[in-house]
């Protein structure tokens, strides 16, 4: 078990609501409304890495892959509770739209 997950008294996820490759929408936070593809699900820490979301800059030492080193932009983790499947999100938005139209009509 991961130390970080252990310190928060969390059990690893048995069944994740999203899987690698799923299209998701961020539902809360500074990246709200943005879409992306799930690259990795971290079950021990209840987090996901989504393509193009929450980009951070990281200093990298020179290596064989990157002989110059420097600063690299990469995706950071997001809490799994802050993302929702895109299909589910669209259904939710459609439902809200219909409710608003009914309210306006009478």
Curated annotation (Swiss-Prot):
One of two assembly initiator proteins, it binds directly to the 5'-end of the 23S rRNA, where it nucleates assembly of the 50S subunit. CDD domains: KOW_RPL26. PANTHER family: MITOCHONDRIAL RIBOSOMAL PROTEIN L24. One of its GO terms (biological process) is translation. The keyword RNA-binding applies. This is Large ribosomal subunit protein uL24. Belongs to the universal ribosomal protein uL24 family. Residues 1-20 are annotated as: Disordered. SUPFAM superfamilies: Translation proteins SH3-like domain.
């Amino acid at each position: 078990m991961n130390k970080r997950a252990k310190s928060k008294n969390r059990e690893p996820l048995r069944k994740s609501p999203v899987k690698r490759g799923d299209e998701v929408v961020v539902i809360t936070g500074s990246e709200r409304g943005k879409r992306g593809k799930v690259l990795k699900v971290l079950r021990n820490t209840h987090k996901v890495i989504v393509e193009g979301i929450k980009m951070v800059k990281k200093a990298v030492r020179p290596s064989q892959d990157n002989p110059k080193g420097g600063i690299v932009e990469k995706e950071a983790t997001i809490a799994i509770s802050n993302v929702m499947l895109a299909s589910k999100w669209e259904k939710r938005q459609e439902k809200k739209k219909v409710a608003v139209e009914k309210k306006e009509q009478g």
